């Protein structure tokens, strides 16, 4: 029987999130730049002899039932493999905050696909795993691949970029008592900004081309595009903790840029390196505590889910 498998499941931030318009299927057409960071969950998997699939987690607030993306990914992969006798006992060590706009759940689901592909000896390649991931969530294909990627469509169409040249540091903050509904954020975006949406595929593609030509690989600053998140314009006015976080981050010395990630409420600031991010965290910790915000200093990483040695 195959030895147990352990993988890391990185969080992501959005360096760019642009809502282009509405698709024929009712979803929003998006243009994003996603980036993996080294705030990571860990998923441990081992075979079961009776074909059962089970999950436990050290975060009591997280459901480990059939609605969990890890369990859903395991069942999908087993179904597609054609081997109904396959089973797994899985344990998630949770470090990415829940409901934070950091794709923690999606990354955990992607981790299950990668880990069980290895555990069960299925030998599926990354593109096959990404296709399965797309059936479960818009962010999940990116979480399989990771690194720095242009993401189009609902987020499932990936165009990899070389790693950012600068070893940027990140200070990430979140109010642990606040979450934002992603469907609400998109519906509110449509209500507020629908009249400005692009109207057809030709217009979508023209905007994609502009993003492909942008200098994403330059150190954040002079030549790099500014951070953009169209959902931030919707969420920030109605979420005091997001306003507080962004004001706090933007005021820090050496902060290059600050923005909200995904549909929030997590916000982040970029620094020239990890050392600057660590020092900024120490400097502002008292203020963050007063605001009720948790914080993490992180680095960019060039990969998604990864097998641990």
Curated annotation (Swiss-Prot):
ATP binds at residues 97-107. It catalyses: 4-CDP-2-C-methyl-D-erythritol + ATP = 4-CDP-2-C-methyl-D-erythritol 2-phosphate + ADP + H(+). Gene3D superfamilies: 3.30.230.10, GHMP kinase, C-terminal domain. The active site is at residues 12, 139. It comes from the Bacteria. This is 4-diphosphocytidyl-2-C-methyl-D-erythritol kinase. The keyword Kinase applies. Keywords: ATP-binding, Isoprene biosynthesis, Kinase, Nucleotide-binding, Transferase. Its EC number is 2.7.1.148. NCBIfam families: ispE (TIGR00154), PRK14608.1 (NF011202). Pathway: Isoprenoid biosynthesis; isopentenyl diphosphate biosynthesis via DXP pathway; isopentenyl diphosphate from 1-deoxy-D-xylulose 5-phosphate: step 3/6. It comes from Synechococcus sp. (strain WH7803). GO terms for biological process: isopentenyl diphosphate biosynthetic process, methylerythritol 4-phosphate pathway; terpenoid biosynthetic process. Belongs to the GHMP kinase family. IspE subfamily. Catalyzes the phosphorylation of the position 2 hydroxy group of 4-diphosphocytidyl-2C-methyl-D-erythritol. SUPFAM superfamilies: GHMP Kinase, C-terminal domain, Ribosomal protein S5 domain 2-like.
């Amino acid at each position: 029987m195959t030895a147990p498998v352990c993988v890391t499941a990185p969080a992501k931030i959005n360096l760019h999130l642009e809502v282009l318009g509405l698709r024929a299927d009712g979803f929003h057409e998006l243009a994003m730049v996603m980036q993996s960071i080294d705030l990571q969950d860990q998923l441990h998997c081992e075979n079961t002899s009776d074909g059962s699939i089970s999950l436990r987690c050290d975060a009591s607030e997280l459901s480990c039932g059939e609605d969990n993306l890890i369990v859903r990914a395991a069942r999908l992969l087993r179904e597609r493999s054609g081997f109904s006798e396959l089973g797994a006992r899985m344990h998630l060590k949770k470090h990415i905050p829940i409901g934070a706009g950091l794709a923690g759940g999606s990354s955990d689901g992607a981790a299950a696909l990668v880990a069980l592909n290895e555990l069960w000896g299925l030998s599926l390649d990354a593109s096959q795993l990404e296709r399965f991931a797309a059936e479960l969530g818009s962010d999940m294909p990116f979480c399989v691949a990771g690194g720095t990627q242009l993401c189009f469509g609902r987020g499932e169409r990936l165009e990899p970029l070389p790693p950012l040249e600068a070893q940027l540091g990140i200070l990430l903050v979140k109010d642990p008592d606040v979450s934002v509904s992603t469907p609400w954020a998109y519906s509110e975006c449509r209500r507020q900004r629908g009249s400005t949406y692009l109207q057809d595929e030709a217009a979508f593609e023209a905007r994609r081309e502009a993003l492909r030509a942008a200098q994403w690989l330059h150190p954040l600053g002079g030549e790099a595009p500014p951070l953009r998140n169209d959902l931030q314009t919707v969420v920030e006015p109605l979420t005091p903790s997001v306003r507080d976080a962004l004001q706090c981050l933007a005021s820090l010395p050496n902060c290059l840029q600050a923005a909200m990630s995904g549909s929030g409420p997590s916000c982040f600031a970029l620094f020239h390196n990890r050392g600057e991010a660590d020092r900024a965290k120490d400097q502002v910790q008292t203020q963050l505590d007063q605001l009720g915000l948790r914080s993490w200093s992180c680095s960019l990483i060039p990969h998604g889910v990864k097998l641990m040695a």
